[in-house]
Amino acid sequence: MSREILHPPGWARARGYANGVAAEGRQVYVAGQIGWDAEQRFVSDDFAAQVRQALANIVAVLACAGAKPEHIVRMTWYVTSRDEYNASLAEIGAAYRELIGRNYPAMSVVVVAGLLEPRAKVEIEATAVI
């Protein structure tokens, strides 16, 4: 895969994400992943624990296509609470670095009123290019 981080001249440095990514190769689309395990049981009601599980689920789906976390070029996070997200940033960052590494794709975080699964606090979609 060839990949280029897009950063307009004069813009402040993006922290923890890229403003854009240009990539060539096989595309892999990962549906929204939530904080439940392979048996569709929630691992925790803790926000950071649900993020960690959702990220682990993304890594597992990517592996089915022969992709790795470094192939991720875009992520969209849907969170049910801005406050819980912000309060958990240190733990989220640690889980992200452990599971995804220091790959910072184009990324959006959207606060939503709720998710389909009532216990879900976060849902993360990913696109990868191999």
Q: Where are the regions that the model predicts?
A:
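Short, polar/acidic, helix-capping and beta-turn segments at strand->helix junctions
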Residues: 2-130
